[in-house]
Structures are given as structure tokens and as C-alpha cells.
Amino acid sequence: MPERLPEFYTAVYRLVSRVPKGKVVTYGQVAALLGVPRAPRGVGTALRNLPRPLSKKVPWQRVINASGGISFRGDVIRVEEQRWLLEDEGIEFSRHGKVDLKKYRWVGPKRWKTPKWKTQL
């Protein structure tokens, strides 16, 4: 793992770390808040590459897909872990495995400073 994280990853981690307990945000929502609305997959990549030491500080489990589901990453154990962590925070799932985004979606910070890397594009 490189010593320095890509600036986009750092911006994702900073934003996701602000999602309160008991709330969720979508990959697309994170991308839009960062000023790159077409980059939800980049958000997923950043979270998939979250360094182990940061996983205690960045609540990665609070990021779900636009339909309210947990995105399968080829690792059933991680999917189960994410659901368990969310349920532990009081988030309920439908019988179809979906989170009610109307109830649990975090709308984002009241003020969000555009990341430095974005202003340099």
C-alpha cells in the first residue's frame, strides 16, 4: 500500500466519516457531494481500498447503493458484516434486504468545502 493515499480517496474518507450513526448515504450521493456526480464507482473503489487502520475511523458500512441495498463485492462475509454493523446502529432492512432511504438517508453536511483536488481540475 502506498504511504500517501490518493486525494480523492482521502476526500471520500473524510466525507464518509461525517455520516452519523444510524444513517446511510449512497455511493452516488458521496460522489455528488464531492463534486464528481459521475464517480460513484470511484467511491466504491476508495472504500474497497480503505486501509485496515482507518476502517475503525471511517464508517464504510454506512455507504450503500442507490436502491438501498448492500453492494455485493464478491465477499459474502463482508456483505453480512456490513448488514450486521448497520443493524447494530438501529438501521432496519426490509424482507428484500433493502434500507428505507426515506427514513435513514443522511442528506449531507450543511456546509462542505470543495476538496482542494477538485478546485485544481
Region locations from a protein language model:
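Nucleic acid-binding interface residues in structured DNA/RNA-binding domains
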Residues: M1-L121
